Amino acid sequence: MSSGYKPDILWSPHHADRYVICDTELSLYRIGPSGSSETKAGALQLSEETAATLLAINSDTPFMKCVAWYPKHEPECLLAVGHTNGRVVLTSLGQSHNSKSKDLAGKEFVPKHARQCNTLAWNPVDSNWLAAGLDKHRADFSVLIWDISSKFSPEAVPAEKVRLSGDADSGLLVTKPLYELGQNDACLSLCWLPRDHQKLLLAGMHRNLAIFDLRNTSQKTFVNTKAIQGVTVDPHFQDRVASYFEGQVAIWDLRKFEKPVFTLNEQPKPLTKVAWCPTRMGLLATLTRDSNIIRLYDMQHTPMPFGDEVEPTIMERGVQPCSESIISSFAWHPSAQNRMVVVSPSRVMNDFTLFERISLAWSSTTSLMWACGRHLYECAEDSGQAAEAEKDIATKMRERAQSRYGHDTVQVWRNHVLAGGDDPQLRSLWYTLHFMKQYTENVEQKQQSNKQSLIYSGIKNIVKSSSGTTETRRCWSGSDRQTDVPRFHSEERSLALQLCGWISQGPDTDVEPFLKSLEQEGEWERAAAVALFNLDIRRAIQILNKGASSEKGDLNLNVVAMALSGYTDEKNSLWREMCSSLRLQLKKPYLCIMFAFLTSEPGAYDGVLYESRVAVRDRVAFACMFLNDAQLPRYIDKLTNEMKEAGNLEGILLTGLTKDGVDLMESYVDRTGDVQTASFCMLKGSPGEVLKDPRVQCWIENYRNLLDAWRFWHKRAEFDIHRSKLDPSSKPLAQVFVSCNFCGKSISYSCSAMPHQGRGFSQYGVSGSPTKSKVTSCPGCRKPLPRCALCLMNMGTPVSSCPGTGKADEKADLTRDKKLAQFNNWFTWCHNCRHGGHAGHMLSWFRDHSECPVSACTCKCMQLDTTGNLVPSDSV
């Protein structure tokens, strides 16, 4: 540590609460909490929480140039002080006469020729060794290593050059150093290398850094550089050294000492101090002359390819401990993380802690963790009802994947229940796909292939193909008024009503089954509206009365039923006038559209068609019944565009699984991020050209990647199987073939051409039935296949049990399953050592072993795969 007339700080290496300020004198301070019993009345306030108390002063060092604190616990508070005349004096602060430092305090180490002492460094292991770096002298060495336990040698130096003063004790003078290095040069800075305490790193005036080994001082390793000031070793990376010249810092790696690893950005002013943080790896602090800012360089370690010389990432920032005061020096706290004390030229001190850079990390399961200093924090998600409603879409998709959402291909509508059953858009989507599937199966039975493709094209395309529409007029059922209401019928409109779920398949167009299902679900208002739209006002009143008397019914439904019973078709009646004005005040949308229908003119049903709170399927079904061939396509087109822009899944009923459906689903994914629903939906019945759409492929691949990230490998395999059934073109080609070692032909290809044998890998080693032959040799050249490393049987022989476990409960009869695709009989081998065998045997072996089962082979087969030791999340 260099001093001068500007204050410098030196922290005790073993006392976390003591430090020394040195300029023209040495002042020992103790730092502690403000207001504590140890803090005296005259303490200096360093921060809002800490204050410093002066313990001792030593004013006997007027020509002090540098100071170094003794590295061991005992003797306590022993310091070496280098002077401008080259002498090194040992002194202590605040010690009693009985302390161990009594014999060493006052001891002086005198060079042959007087010149300035620039730097001092204690050996961290042999603590009796003290290295001093001096200015150049043509007849003397610049680096002297003193042994503080050595005695005075009167014959070594003339007496007139030994004595410091007339009354000095000659027993305290040492003039013969233990080692002398660096002849005809100057030493500006030096440090001991922690990795080898016999080595010393010197920085000399001849612009070189040199490493000396005290066991052979005639040999040295050196490199030419201008950065020869302030050499210091990173305490957490002992091969990394920092040095500086003027405003530039060089970082060295002692293992590759030819040139600096990298240099930091040059500062406009000369540097005065550089120091590594003792509590944080790779954090370097620098200070420039006449500055109030300390610059910090955080050196990050990033993985890099072998052989590439890539500089590490450095994050630079500046801190300003004092608002306006110039900083003379600073010192890191030896144990408190990111804490330092700074001092100004007027000895004003400030204690502060740096804010740590925070690193955030999201896991694939949406858990959040962040690191701050030495602490790791995990963010726990609130499990309350509000948090349940605000779950991230990734969390929802993960939970749905665990419930096998999307995989029910028989009762397709149940998929919305697997998703939680609380999303009306998902409910509408899966019911739409369910009705499409039902009608498709009915068409297949009737062998009407021309209609099969029309079903999944959506109501928009179905309506456009409508022909032969007939208009009928029907009277109200259950009303005294015999007003005729016009309705429209066609085969395509009936198909649309079936897809909306209003009527069932077949010639019967009765809505009564649909009304009963709505009553069972407690949707009284919706059921009454559907009955009213089918011109059965008495049934609507009956449903409302039943709903009012139910356990959770609304008594106001009786009032609505009473209002319906007074229906009249007279345009100027009081009933019609009051219903038109008061219906908008009704909070329930289905009650509102009921009165809108009753008070509207034929063909002008905007109050029903554009009520956004009503389900799309009900509005579309109403339109198919009451709009003519000119009005219906216009309305469907307008509603389709609204659904596409909003990304509303109810619009799949209109678009179908077509390009318009992909556009709608794209808006939905952009809004929600739900690639899971998008993938399953598009696989249900889309034509080949839609499945080849890059957007659809992107959703599917992203969902597969999500399953892999969640370690749902079994579920991803299920999804791939599900996908290959619905989209045969997605089945990937075989990527691995087993070829014969003798003839080189593919065994699987040869076997696939053999009659009565099945295809591919599946038949190897599976007995199947007595009539099936075993494939234990190459079908091409009849040479035997390799042997299993454990059972020593030729591959193709069926496995019986898994040897190597030694536990009866772990053994299994692997031949009880007679399927040809039994996994335990498959070939498996290590890509490194090429040894292998039956998959079942290999799995059993590597449960208890890490090395290859072949004798004399030390290959760690299972550990070569980074995922070899991972456990699927869906099997935990």
Swiss-Prot record:
Residues that bind Zn(2+) 3: C830, C833, C861
Keywords tagged on the record: Lysosome, Membrane, Metal-binding, Repeat, WD repeat, Zinc, Zinc-finger
Keyword match Metal-binding: yes
Activity regulation information from UniProt: The GATOR2 complex is negatively regulated by the upstream amino acid sensors CASTOR1 and SESN2, which sequester the GATOR2 complex in absence of amino acids. In the presence of abundant amino acids, GATOR2 is released from CASTOR1 and SESN2 and activated.
Stored InterPro entries: MIOS/Sea4 (IPR037593), MIOS_a-sol (IPR049092), WD40/YVTN_repeat-like_dom_sf (IPR015943), WD40_repeat_dom_sf (IPR036322), WD40_rpt (IPR001680), Zn_ribbon_mio (IPR031488)
Positions of Zn(2+) 4 binding: C833, H835, C852, C857
Cellular component terms per the entry's GO annotation: cytoplasm; GATOR2 complex; lysosomal membrane
Zinc finger (C4-type): 738-784
Family listed: Belongs to the WD repeat mio family.
Name listed for the protein in its UniProt record: GATOR2 complex protein MIOS
UniProt source species: Danio rerio
Source organism phylogeny: Eukaryota, Metazoa, Chordata, Craniata, Vertebrata
